Design a protein with these regions (language model features):
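P-loop NTPase catalytic core
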Residues: 1-231
C-alpha cells in the first residue's frame, strides 16, 4: 500500500496497477479503500487457479497496451509465488523439480516478470513483485530461488525487526540493486558501502534510520554522515 501511495503521489503521470493473486478478500477490500489513484485487480483465494492466471494475463496485456501508447506503467504483484503455484497446479509435463515444481510451470510467470522494460519508442513497464520465503514449503523456496536472479533489485524484509516493531522492517545488508553504481553518485556509493560495513557491528538499524530521517536527500545525508559517524 505504501509503495502504491508513494508512486501515485510522486509520479502522478504513471499508471499504477496492483495485482493481487490468491489473496484474502479482506486484504483486497482494505487496499481498494486506502489506495487512491491506482487500479486494483484481484483474484481471491476462493477462486480457482484458472481465474488467478486469467487475471494476471489481463493485467499484463493491458499494461503492454498502455506502454505502447507511451505510458509509464508500474505493476505491483502480490505475489509471484502464488502466481507460479497456480500455473504449477494446472501444468502436467511429466517432469518434476525439487519441491514438486513442474519446470513448465515457470514459463509463463517468467514471461510475466520478464515483460518489464524501458522501450525506446513508447513508455516503460516496471514490475515489483513479492515472493514468499520461510513458509516451510520447499516449493516456495524453489520458486524464490528461480526468480531471485531475474530481478534488478531485491528488498529483503526482516522478521526480527518487525517483531521489534521497527519499521520499515528491511534487512538492509541482504537488500540491494544491480548496477547501483549507475543509480548513485560516487559519494553516495561510497557512503552506502561504509554503512553496510558498520551495520550490525558499530551501528544499529535504529541509528541508521535516525540519520536518514534527519535528512531530506541522499546528498544531504552524504554531507552530514561523516560528522555523525565520527561522534
Amino acid at each position: 500500500k505504501d509503495i502504491a501511495c508513494s508512486l501515485t503521489a510522486g509520479y502522478p503521470g504513471s499508471e499504477v496497477i496492483i495485482l493481487l493473486i490468491d489473496e484474502r478478500p479482506e486484504e483486497v477490500t482494505d487496499i481498494r479503500r486506502t489506495v487512491s489513484g491506482a487500479r486494483v485487480v484481484y483474484s481471491t483465494f476462493d477462486r480457482g487457479e484458472h481465474h488467478h492466471i486469467h487475471a494476471a494475463n489481463l493485467v499484463l496485456e493491458h499494461a503492454k497496451r498502455l506502454v505502447e501508447a507511451g505510458k509509464d506503467v508500474v505493476i505491483l504483484l502480490d505475489s509471484i509465488t502464488r502466481l507460479t503455484r497456480a500455473y504449477n497446479s494446472v501444468t502436467n509435463s511429466g517432469r518434476m523439480l525439487s519441491g514438486g515444481l513442474d519446470p513448465q510451470a515457470l514459463i509463463e510467470p517468467r514471461k510475466f516478470f520478464g515483460a518489464a522494460r524501458n522501450t525506446e519508442d513508447g513508455g516503460s513497464l516496471t514490475i515489483i513483485a513479492t515472493a514468499l520465503v520461510d513458509t516451510g514449503s520447499r516449493l516456495d523456496d524453489v520458486i524464490y530461488e528461480e526468480f531471485k536472479a531475474a530481478g534488478n533489485m531485491e528488498l529483503v524484509l526482516s522478521r526480527e525487526l518487525a517483531e521489534r516493531r521497527i519499521f520499515p522492517a528491511i534487512d538492509i545488508k541482504s537488500s540491494g540493486a544491480r548496477k547501483e553504481e549507475l543509480l548513485l553518485s560516487p559519494e553516495e556509493l561510497d557512503l552506502s558501502c561504509k554503512l553496510r560495513q558498520l551495520l550490525g557491528r558499530q551501528m544499529s538499524v535504529e541509528a541508521l534510520y535516525s540519520m536518514i530521517n534527519k535528512t531530506k536527500t541522499n546528498a544531504e545525508l552524504v554531507l552530514r554522515a561523516e560528522e555523525w559517524l565520527n561522534k
